[in-house]
C-alpha cells in the first residue's frame, strides 16, 4: 500500500516515542515520508514536524512527501473538530483524508461514545486496530474472522 497520509492514534500518549523510534528505524531512511505530530510528548524531538512545517517542506522542496502523523485519542477528543465540546485545535487532521488510520492499544479507551464520535468525524479509507490483548472485542464479535490476525510468541520460534 502506498498510503499518502497515515494517522496513528493511541489512548496512551506515552508510546509516541516508540512509534517515532520505529518510524526512524524501519521507514524514514528508505522512503520520502515525514513524521508529523503536535503532541506534547514529541515536541522538540528531532525529525518530528508540526503540520505547518510539513506543508512548508513539501512546498519549499517541491516534493510530495507522504505523511505519518501521530495524535493521542485524548487530543482528538479535546478538539472541536472531533468532539462536541472541544477547543479549536487539530483542524489540519479534520481537513485531511487519511488512507489509513492505525488505532494502537485499541483495547483501551476506544469503546466510548466520544471515541465513536471522533472517529466518525474523521475522513479515512481504512482503519487498522492493533492490540496485544483484544479479549473484549473478540468476545463481543466486533470483528469478523477474516478481519483478525493472530501472532504469538510461539509463532516466532
Segments the model singles out, each with a brief description of its role:
Residues 2-28, 32-34, 38-40, 73-75:
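Conserved Walker A/P-loop ATP-binding site and its immediately adjacent core
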Residues 4, 67, 99, 125, ...:
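Conserved acidic residues
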Residues 7-9, 68-72, 100-102:
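Structural motif
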Residues 16-19, 43-45, 78-80, 136-141:
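Switch/connector loops and helix/strand junctions flanking conserved nucleotide-binding motifs
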Residues 22-26, 84-87, 116-117, 141-147:
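Short secondary-structure boundary/capping segments
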Residues 30-84:
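Inter-Walker segment of RecA-like/P-loop motor cores
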Residues 73-80, 87-129, 133-136:
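SF2 helicase catalytic motif II
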Residues 144-157:
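Interdomain hinge/linker at the junction between the two RecA-like core domains of SF2 helicases
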Amino acid at each position: 500500500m502506498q498510503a499518502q497520509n497515515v494517522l496513528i492514534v493511541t489512548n496512551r500518549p506515552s508510546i509516541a516515542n516508540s512509534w517515532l523510534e520505529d518510524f526512524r528505524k524501519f521507514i524514514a531512511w528508505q522512503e520520502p515520508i515525514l513524521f508529523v505530530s503536535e503532541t506534547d510528548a514529541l515536541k522538540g524531538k528531532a525529525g518530528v514536524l508540526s503540520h505547518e512545517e510539513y506543508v512548508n517542506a513539501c512546498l519549499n522542496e517541491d516534493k510530495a512527501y507522504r505523511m505519518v502523523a501521530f495524535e493521542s485519542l485524548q487530543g482528538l477528543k479535546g478538539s472541536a473538530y472531533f468532539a462536541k465540546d472541544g477547543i479549536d485545535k487539530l483542524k489540519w487532521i479534520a481537513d485531511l483524508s487519511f488512507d489509513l488510520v492505525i488505532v494502537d492499544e485499541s483495547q483501551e479507551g476506544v469503546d466510548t461514545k466520544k471515541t465513536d464520535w471522533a472517529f466518525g468525524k474523521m475522513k479515512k479509507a481504512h482503519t487498522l486496530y492493533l492490540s496485544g490483548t483484544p479479549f473484549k472485542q473478540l468476545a463481543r464479535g466486533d470483528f469478523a474472522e477474516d478481519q483478525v490476525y493472530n501472532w504469538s510468541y510461539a509463532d516466532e520460534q
